[in-house]
Structures are given as C-alpha cells and as structure tokens.
Amino acid sequence: MAAGCLVGQRAGPLSDKLSGYCWVLLPLLLVATAQASVCRLKTGDGRDSESCGTNLELEHSFELDDSIHFKKRGSLIWSGTAEQSISILQKQLTEDERNKLRDIANLNGLYRIRVPRKLGITEEANEYVTSFVRACSMVESHLSDQISVHTDISGNVVGISIVTFPGSCNGAEVEDVDLEMFNTTVYIQQPIAAAVPETAAFIERLEMEQAQKAKNPQEQKSFFAKYWMYIIPVVLFLMMSGASDAGNQGGNGGGGGGSGGGR
C-alpha cells in the first residue's frame, strides 16, 4: 500500500510531501506486521514457543488398513497465564479425508489423536500422548468431540482423552456437509492439590489451652481433691453400716448357743 502511493505522482512540492508521507507510512506498516507475528516467531517441532502462550500441535490418524499415520489436525493454543486457559484452531477435512473416514467407520476402525509431551525435542525423539475413539462415533457425531489435556501439577502434559457426542454407533446416515468442520470443546484437566494439614494452627491451639490451664490451677485438681467432702461421708456411712451388721450377727449366734445348753 505504501509503495503504491508513489506511483503516478507528479514532480513538485505537493508530490514531494506526499512521497515523504508514504515513506513514513511504510515503516509503520512493517512495525505493525512484526508485532502481529510476535506470538508465532519461534517454531519448534510439535510445539511453538510464543510470548503469549504455547502452540501445541494436534495430530490425527485414520487409515483403512488400521496402520497409524498421523497428520496435523490443528493447534491447541495454550495460554501462559496462571489460569491455564486453552483454545483450538483446526483445519477443515478435505473431500478425500471425509470419504476415507466414512470407509473406516464402515469397517469399525479407529480414529486416533495425539499431542507431544515435551517442548524443544525433534519429532523423531519426541514423546506423545494418544487417545482414540471408534471412527463410526466420530462420523455420527458430525465431528463433535471433546478433548481433555491432562497435566501434572507443574503444567506438563501427561495424557489426553477424547469423547464424542453422542458416543454410540447406530448406523445413522450422515450428510457430507456435516463432516467438513470439527466442533470441538477442549479442556485442561489439572490435579487438585490435597489439603495441607493445619499443623501450625493445631499447635497454636494446643499451646493456648495449656496456657489457659496454667492460669486456672483449680481445673487441674484430681477427682478426690475436688469431691472429698462428698466422698468421706459416704465412706463413713458404709463403715458404720458394716459395723452394725457385724454386731447383730454376733448377738444372734450367742442366743442360739444358750438354748442348746439348756437341753
């Protein structure tokens, strides 16, 4: 656009001014173009390092002979923020791919996906996590699927899963137009950290209870020290009752002996 404004200009003061404006506009356009591509400058194998996040390449495979040959399906755009949000960009299936997917579905074949686990490793040495569904469920769902990327607590990819909606195969007829575009929902599944024991709070509460007891020594008295005025009368009563019972038994025994001597 900037170069085009130099064409057909007449020589003269006005032409010189317009030419100057065009040369000023050209660097501005170049700067704007460079800024728009900042997130796509550094490309790796399977993943692209970006200042605004990580581009994780999503591949799929569906072959008539049940062999595995992965091709690019799209990209998972992984934000570098603390919220760990993720979005997806996908290609449209070609006519040949749609026909092949139908044929594989009729043969009860599998539809596979994969993503790389590590960043900065060549494709030959890289490790992938994979998942699959039946190709017929992919067809009958009209390419409506849900992909979940599973990560560890540090954010590293440890697994991937895919499900279709619906997930059954009933032999339903599907129009060719329904197999052009993917309708995908993608999630990040991160482990939930277990609750940390409140050790410090427990120790603090225990120390407060001990300090409270130290301030009130009355609470630390033994059971006897607290209730001796009730215990002693009961003990004395039991002792006196036992002594009177013993005296009565002795008197009855003496009377019986006297009767025997009279005979």
UniProtKB/Swiss-Prot annotation:
Keywords: Endoplasmic reticulum, Membrane, Signal, Transmembrane, Transmembrane helix. Residues 35-222 are lumenal. It is a single-pass type I membrane protein. GO terms for cellular component: EMC complex; endoplasmic reticulum membrane; membrane. The chain crosses the membrane at residues 223-243. It comes from the Eukaryota. One of its GO terms (biological process) is tail-anchored membrane protein insertion into ER membrane. Residues 1-34 form the signal peptide. Residues 244-263 are cytoplasmic. It is found in: Endoplasmic reticulum membrane. CDD domains: EMC10 (cd22209). Component of the ER membrane protein complex (EMC). Part of the endoplasmic reticulum membrane protein complex (EMC) that enables the energy-independent insertion into endoplasmic reticulum membranes of newly synthesized membrane proteins. Preferentially accommodates proteins with transmembrane domains that are weakly hydrophobic or contain destabilizing features such as charged and aromatic residues. Involved in the cotranslational insertion of multi-pass membrane proteins in which stop-transfer membrane-anchor sequences become ER membrane spanning helices. Belongs to the EMC10 family. This is ER membrane protein complex subunit 10. It comes from Xenopus tropicalis (Western clawed frog). The gene is emc10.
